[in-house]
Structure formats: structure tokens, C-alpha cells
A protein has these predicted regions:
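Conserved Class I S-adenosyl-L-methionine
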Residues: 6, 30, 37, 63-65, ...
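Class I SAM-dependent methyltransferase SAM/SAH-binding core
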Residues: 55-113
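Conserved catalytic/acceptor-binding region of the Class I
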Residues: 138, 144, 148-212, 231-236
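Conserved class I S-adenosyl-L-methionine
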Residues: 2-52, 65-69
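A short SAM/SAH-binding and catalytic strip from SAM-dependent methyltransferases
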Residues: 122-135
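A short acidic, Gly/Pro-enriched loop at the edge of an enzyme's catalytic core
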Residues: 112-123
Length: 271
């Protein structure tokens, strides 16, 4: 039996991110096989302008990788609140950042109902998470509300062609996986600037140039199994064998498109 879960299904999101295990599998693939020598989190941090002093909120902080990988760049005196809907993720972020010299605060919260007063933050970050939010308009309204009038919202996401070769690989293995990895057109992707225009006066986007050249069939299979699909043990074994054959047929590697970037939205219309 093959099951494909919706990317914003609350039950799926809750199970998927109850701890860091699935996320770590996906991060490892990108860390080992990305062609851009500047890692994603180092690049992303360069796109974020942090005023001094700064009050910052990150929604969906995951394991805290953005801050762990940029600890040498953190501005002094910044008040950084890291939050996630998953208590397991918050705990992992706390552990990962225990030795980092910065003023971190941690919170479990829902982006659709942010428990801070209007105009609290200079910067709000939502990295690769808005497509998981069931009521995105409500979340964007909340983000615009808690930003200061001159504050900036940074929202990273992927484009519709992100990992397109991997999606095609999955569909060749099983036509029931045709929609594995596909992002609905009304989700939040790099073509979704119009969604931000309802809440912010300006929004610009920067893309991160990168691709994957994967030479480890087992890790690629683990990546595919780490999110949105449920396969029986027998079908998992069949997928692993299929990926290995495909990689061998392509000279021992599979080249995969990456399309990621970040919006910077300014001028909250709810300030």
C-alpha cells in the first residue's frame, strides 16, 4: 500500500516533526551532495539584515541550525526567540545551541496564533515552514501584526521545480507516487509573492544557486522515505533496489535540481 500525505495536513506535520529524525535525514543529503560550497544556512543568514539592537522571532526553528551554523556572526545584544509547533524540535534546538553565546529564548507556539503584542519584533523569520501551515493567511496576518512598522519578515521556501528529477524518479517507481514531493499551486513557494502582498507593502526574493549530485543510493532512498509517503516494508525494499539501479544506469550518480530562496517582506499593512 502507498500513502501520500498532504504537505499541510496537521496530523502529518505533527508526526513528521515530533523529533528531528526525519529532518536530519534530509539535511544530511543536502550537506553531503550539494554543489554550492557555501551552505544554505550560511547563505540564508547573509540575506537577513539584523538591526542593532534587535528583537527577533523565528517560527519553525527546527533544530536551530541557522544559529548553530552562524554563531560567529550573531550580533551582540540581540534578543532571539526561537519557536516551533513541535516540543521535540524546541528541545533539540535548546540542546544544539546550549554552548552558543547569544540571548536565546525558546517557545512552543503556533504561527497561526502568536502570543506577542503588536509591534514586538524587528525581524520575523519563517524558514521552509509556511507551506506546512493550514491557515496561511491567518499566520501571515499574525506575523504582520507582531512586526514593528519598520520590521522585516524573511520567509524561505522552494520553487515548483525543486527536486524535480527526484519527483520523476518516484513516479517511475510507482505511479501512485506521482504527487510525492509536488507542492500544490496554492501552497507557499517562490512564486507566491502575491500572498505576501496582502500583508506587506513590498516583497522581494533572492534565489540560492545550487543542485545535488547524489552518489549514495541508500541515503537518497532514506530521503524519499523520510517524508510524505508511507510504504510497506516490502515496497521500501523495492524502492531501494530501484534507486540503486537508476543510479548505476546514470553512471553512479543522480543529478537533481534545487530551487530554494528567501522573500524579504517590508511595510506591514497591519502595523
Amino acid at each position: 500500500m502507498t500513502t501520500v500525505h498532504g504537505i499541510s495536513d496537521p496530523n502529518y506535520v505533527s508526526r513528521q516533526y515530533r523529533d528531528a529524525s526525519n529532518l536530519n535525514v534530509r539535511l544530511r543529503l543536502h550537506q553531503e551532495f550539494s554543489t554550492n560550497p557555501q551552505g544554505w544556512h550560511r547563505w540564508l543568514f547573509e540575506q537577513i539584515q539584523l538591526p542593532r539592537p534587535c528583537r527577533l522571532l523565528e517560527l519553525g526553528c527546527g533544530t536551530g541550525s541557522l544559529w548553530a551554523e552562524n554563531q560567529d556572526r550573531l550580533p551582540q545584544g540581540a534578543e532571539i526567540t526561537l519557536s516551533d509547533l513541535s516540543a521535540g524540535m524546541v528541545t533539540q534546538a535548546q540542546e544544539n545551541l546550549r554552548s552558543v553565546r547569544a540571548e536565546f529564548r525558546f517557545a512552543g507556539l503556533d504561527a497561526q496564533s502568536i502570543p506577542f503584542q503588536q509591534g514586538t519584533f524587528d525581524v520575523v523569520i519563517a524558514s521552509h515552514m509556511l507551506y506546512h501551515v493550514p491557515d496561511r493567511e491567518k499566520a501571515l496576518g499574525e506575523i504582520a501584526r507582531v512586526l514593528k512598522p519598520d520590521g522585516v519578515f524573511y520567509a524561505s521556501t522552494v520553487g515548483l521545480d525543486h527536486l524535480k528529477e527526484l519527483k520523476e524518479l518516484a513516479a517511475r517507481f510507482d505511479e501512485d507516487l506521482l504527487f510525492w514531493g509536488q507542492m500544490p499551486a496554492d501552497s507557499f513557494h517562490l512564486g507566491s509573492g502575491v500572498q505576501l502582498s496582502r500583508f506587506f507593502a513590498q516583497a522581494s526574493v533572492q534565489r540560492y544557486p545550487d543542485s545535488l549530485v547524489v552518489t549514495d543510493a541508500a541515503l537518497l532512498t532514506a530521503y524519499m522515505l523520510s517524508g510524505r509517503i508511507d510504504l510497506s516494508a516490502e515496497r521500501q525494499e523495492a524502492l531501494a533496489a530501484f534507486v540503486a539501479r537508476e543510479m548505476q544506469a546514470h553512471g553512479g550518480q543522480i543529478v537533481i535540481t534545487k530551487d530554494s530562496g528567501v522573500f524579504a517582506a517590508r511595510g506591514s499593512l497591519h502595523a
